[in-house]
């Protein structure tokens, strides 16, 4: 297979990059009590000794904390990016300097270079895969099926990846077990809602230097991510409009007090459009034709297919970089539509993208770490297919977080527990 070289050999000044990345990783670790606790436990018990972990993730400081936690547990790790624009090269270089880690991630790698890096990870013959978006798992199945027999299992971080895996599982095409980390409460209720809401809005505001107050903000999709974006935007005094295709979610958004309408109508009134659906062609030519001059378009879904930029380019008479991270498309009538981060994941792919807040990702990556531990320890218990994260693992992460926050909570008495498990007690 054609593979890419490690990041350190591709940088002009790898030592300087490592120093910058190391500082970012150390700062993240200082604010990640869950991973810090797991790192101490893993270092003592070596639960991943002898394993090789292949990863395709957003390679930035918080991810690096997860990578180093698993390396300290005894694993050899090979990692690359899961999005062409989300890698922080300094962080990648700092990881590559670790004796048990090889990093192939580099910002800007796309097309053939992107998949060469994935192939480089797979050349390490991983026994566990840790994925964000599903590209690593699908590359294994489509191009390197000879690796499947030695892969214990994997984990998937994000909504889009889980959707892809479930579709694969429905077709009986998924040949090893994968935990749907995205769907477990300690990830979904915090990372998807608070993480996406805060980081997407913060990155849009910093990239454009515009305020949310008084803006008509169109949120496409009212799943966990869209719910978080809508809540945070409303909290900054924006007027929130929600578009949906699922009637119950549309009703939920309506009952939460948001305006709900089809995208064709929202296109005529929105100032800022933010897609959170995980689907393609959410905003297309027909919508661009209705939009006002100066609108801002951004995507918080995993792939760059939600805002159809081919349609927009066909409509435009000129394009320019209006500001770093902002691509302006001028239409024939003089209207200008502004796309952030090339339509990619705005909270990570924008020039100032830092991703979700550290504390939120500590929870998600804590779940990732214990899921990998579980796969290795109990490898015979999981058949091929998508698996929910065992509830006891999710609770373990919640307990570590509460202890770190100094929060105490009640426990059921034996009598209460017996009552909850019984069916004989009626009126």
Curated annotation (Swiss-Prot):
The protein's required cofactors: NAD(+)
The compartments listed are: Cytoplasm
Extract the coiled-coil ranges from the record: none
Q: What reaction is this protein's catalytic activity?
A: S-adenosyl-L-homocysteine + H2O = L-homocysteine + adenosine
Q: Which Gene3D superfamilies match?
A: Adenosylhomocysteinase-like (3.40.50.1480), NAD(P)-binding Rossmann-like Domain (3.40.50.720)
**Residues annotated to bind NAD(+):** 158-160, 192, 221-226, 244, 279, 300-302, 347
Similarity field: Belongs to the adenosylhomocysteinase family.
Question: What is the name attached to this protein's record?
Answer: Adenosylhomocysteinase
Q: Which gene encodes it?
A: ahcY
